[in-house]
Amino acid sequence: MKQQHASGRVAAFFDLDGTLVARPSLERRFFAELRYRSAIPMGNYFSWLARAVWLAPCGMQMMLQANKMYLRGLPKDGRESHNGGQPPRHGSGQAKMAVPRFFPEGLEQVAWHAQQGHAIVLVSGTLEPLAQEMALALVVRLALRGITASVAVCATRLEQSGGRWTGRILGDAMFGEAKARAVAQLARCKGFDLTECYAYGDSLSDRSMLEAVGRPAAVNPSSRMERLARRRGWSVFTWREAKDLTQSSQRPAQRARRGDEPLLGSGRVG
């Protein structure tokens, strides 16, 4: 890796689900939390099904990614329940997702980028409010290490009306080509040199984003993603939850290095 003489022109783009945090996805966790709090009106399930039928010709992936009708009419701050007027099962009734833990090795990689002066950007198909919560949590975790950094977010935006979600999204769901377009647009606005930028993702929906930068890496990749990464000569990492680190540390870690770049976790190239 060449020494960075203009670190302000470099960004590190991170997917969230499966890359920085373990699955299930953030949206699935949020949906489960809403259901547990009885925050979803029964009619929203039928609205979701109707929307799914309408999107069916676009394929299963689009049917799931662009269909947020289960959120229709819900207040954006998550207050209120729809359980027959009974108090919510949790004190305040706020339907907010508990922030999951970041992979320790992923957090180390983010910290390294922040220390180099690289911009940190979360590029995720999850709902924008959830990605913003994760960005805030990431800023806090970095601050605990004495690192001051901001974290930008590119995620699936939700339409609002009168302080409530309509169930429709604004623009495209942040998957596939939409990720690459978001990265390119941000690069134009911020003056990033994409040939010097980094991107981390776990699935083929991240492929376009990884292809858009000069330093792509597959993290905890699906089998198809790993085959692609090997063909392209991309770095491949395995980042684990904290409970798995003791076991993994007993095996010699293979590390692929480019100059002074730390590649964390069980890393390999091609």
Where do the PLM segments sit?
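C-terminal cap/substrate-recognition subdomain and adjoining C-terminal extension
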Residues: 2-3, 7-11, 93, 97-270
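Active-site neighborhood of HAD-like aspartate-dependent phosphohydrolases
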Residues: 2-61
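Active-site phosphate-binding/coordination module
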Residues: 23, 79, 156
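A generic alpha-helix surface/boundary motif
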Residues: 24-28, 64-65, 129, 177, ...
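Short, surface-exposed acidic
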Residues: 39-46, 76-81, 143-150, 194
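A general structural signal for well-ordered secondary-structure junctions
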Residues: 39-43, 85, 216, 235
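Short, compositionally biased "basic patch" segments
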Residues: 49-76, 152-159
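Metal-dependent phosphoesterase signature
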Residues: 62-108, 116
